[in-house]
């Protein structure tokens, strides 16, 4: 997108009565912004990649637990699309990181522990590449600017919305841990070889339901998600204006296609 087009979109949405709910993710070289139907990846080198989100059948969107798992899976779509954000080897790495913990559920205790630590360290190394933490803060700031109708001010640098977000995946992760522990401890059925896998999937689904529920009340969300908000002080850094603009370009691209004039 040309800068003039970006600014037109920002000014348009500053005047909007209602705005769509967007999500996103940060990478070492840019920011991905995700809408219901479209996503965009703006890179720090000025390039832009656009794509569409997978279509979820309407009946499944209203089905408790299934809708959460589908929403979670859909959030990874920009990474795994053939012409998406990640390249071939990176897609394989991410698939391994996602699937390995499920496989470790069947492993002996010490194997699962070692595998879990190795997986966590590998994922942290991937997340901490380049300026990911700064771009993570920029992603949050761009979305907050949309919700506060301060997009143009944020582009100009005269406004600095929060770099912390209630909808950040960090909050989801910190909520998932206690849910998974409690689920494993109080699993009511006789233990079998597949019990750990079932508990893991149900924990993900239940956490998504809880995560969605608490966000309906901003005050409740701030209390329940306080550990995640605290952890964001480690997973985000104060972005430069140029990095915030990268996120705003991705955001403008999604808005232009989600709700065209």
What do these predicted ranges mean?
Residues 1-80:
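Divalent-cation
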Residues 30, 168, 231:
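Residue-level signature of catalytic and energy-coupling elements of molecular machines
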Residues 36-38, 105-136, 200-216:
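Hydrophobic alpha-helical membrane-embedded segments
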Residues 40-56, 123-155, 211-232:
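Juxtamembrane helix-loop transition segments at the membrane interface in multi-pass membrane proteins
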Residues 62, 66-81, 139, 143, ...:
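Membrane-interacting alpha-helical segments
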Residues 85-104, 161-185, 190:
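Transmembrane alpha-helical segments and their cytosolic interface motifs
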Residues 176-205, 260-261:
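Hydrophobic alpha-helical transmembrane segments and immediately flanking/interface helices
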Residues 217-261:
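Cytosolic/matrix-facing juxtamembrane and C-terminal tails of multi-pass cellular membrane proteins
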């Amino acid at each position: 997108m040309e800068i003039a087009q970006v600014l037109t979109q920002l000014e348009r949405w500053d005047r909007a009565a209602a705005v769509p709910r967007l999500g996103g993710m940060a990478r070492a070289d840019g920011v991905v912004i995700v809408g219901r139907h479209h996503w965009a990846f703006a890179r720090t080198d000025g390039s832009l990649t656009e794509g569409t989100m997978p279509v979820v059948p309407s009946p499944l969107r209203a089905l408790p637990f299934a809708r959460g798992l589908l929403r979670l899976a859909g959030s990874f779509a920009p990474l795994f699309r053939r012409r998406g954000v990640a390249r071939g080897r990176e897609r394989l790495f991410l698939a391994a990181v996602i699937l390995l913990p499920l496989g470790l559920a069947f492993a002996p205790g010490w194997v699962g522990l070692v595998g879990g630590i190795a997986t966590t360290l590998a994922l942290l190394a991937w997340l901490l590449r380049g300026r990911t933490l700064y771009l993570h803060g920029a992603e949050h700031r761009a979305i907050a600017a949309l919700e506060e109708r301060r997009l143009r001010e944020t582009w100009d640098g005269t406004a600095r919305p929060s770099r912390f977000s209630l909808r950040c995946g960090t909050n989801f992760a910190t909520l998932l841990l206690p849910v998974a522990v409690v689920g494993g401890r109080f699993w009511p059925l006789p233990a079998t070889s597949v019990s750990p896998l079932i508990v893991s999937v149900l924990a993900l689904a239940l956490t998504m339901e809880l995560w969605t529920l608490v966000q309906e009340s901003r005050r409740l969300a701030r209390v329940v998600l306080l550990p995640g908000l605290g952890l964001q002080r480690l997973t985000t850094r104060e972005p430069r204006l140029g990095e915030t603009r990268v996120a705003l370009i991705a955001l403008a691209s999604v808005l232009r296609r989600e709700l065209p004039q």
